[in-house]
A protein has these predicted regions:
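N-terminal helical cap/lid subdomain that shapes the substrate entry/recognition surface
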Residues: 12-19, 23-106, 113
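Acidic, Mg2+-coordinating phosphoryl-transfer loop and its flanking beta/alpha structural elements
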Residues: 181-219
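Short acidic-hydrophobic, aromatic-tinged amphipathic segments that line or gate anion-handling sites
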Residues: 148, 219-225
Length: 236
């Protein structure tokens, strides 16, 4: 027998993207709509707080906001319905304020050209996620029909499993070692580890490179304007 060492691959054939803080910024349009939805349902408007909503599902955020105004968690469904409608009514504003981060368009196109399947794992409700992706000009190459969303499952790991299940049902069954979740929060990393896939973190959200480094991600980048380290790792 030889002394060959088998090195685990970090090749990427499937990338599951977070949206807010990772692919694009949307000017807080949906966040404002969230506060307005709670006010509409309960009659009390939440006071904007510096809470950590990053990586949370929209139903979780609705529950937190209801608690903040002393309302019953049973109103979550009502808040989410109001949220969907309010964002639909503000699509013009959303389109005007949404932009992809530097390097995102080129990176997505590069991955698509290499045959990498790309969809999303996000806490956004499905309709709102699609609106944001369309506003950012990211459909295609993102395939939202295979994504996992805040209204797909009760926690983020389950949301990722929904996305992987949808890809599998369409005949795309990658080795878990070739699947990557890319996000901007520790919750994205926890999600990736929970489902047994790789994770890249980018500091285009609210956390710095220093805050993200050391959490255990496979790679941390300041942004996606220079994706060469990522592409090298992904063997693309």
């Amino acid at each position: 027998m030889g002394n060959d060492v088998v090195v685990p691959t970090m090749r990427a054939t499937t990338v599951l993207w977070d949206i807010d803080g990772t692919l694009l910024r949307s000017g807080g349009v949906a966040a404002q709509a969230f506060l307005d939805a709670v006010a509409e349902v309960t009659g009390s408007r939440p006071t904007p707080e510096r809470r950590d909503y990053g990586g949370r599902l929209d139903p979780e955020i609705a529950d937190m906001l209801l608690t903040a105004v002393g309302a019953a968690p049973a109103r979550v469904a009502d808040v989410l319905e109001a949220l969907r409608r309010l964002v639909d009514e503000r699509l013009g504003e959303l389109r005007a304020q949404t932009s992809a981060y530097p390097g995102v368009d080129a990176l997505l196109a590069k991955l698509a050209g290499a045959g990498v399947r790309q969809t999303v794992v996000t806490g956004n409700l499905a309709s709102i996620a699609r609106h944001k992706l369309e506003a950012g000009g990211l459909i295609p190459p993102i395939e939202p029909g295979f994504g996992g969303y805040g209204d797909s499952a009760p926690d983020r790991a389950a949301v990722a499993r929904v996305a992987l299940g949808r890809l599998s049902a369409a005949g795309w069954r990658p080795d878990p070692g070739e699947v990557w979740i890319v996000g901007d929060t520790p919750r994205d990393l926890a999600c990736a580890r929970a489902v047994g896939v790789h994770c890249a973190l980018v500091a285009t959200g609210r956390r710095t490179v220093g805050e993200l480094t050391g959490l255990g991600a496979d790679i941390v980048l300041p942004d996606l304007s220079d994706p060469r380290p990522l592409l090298s790792l992904w063997q693309i």
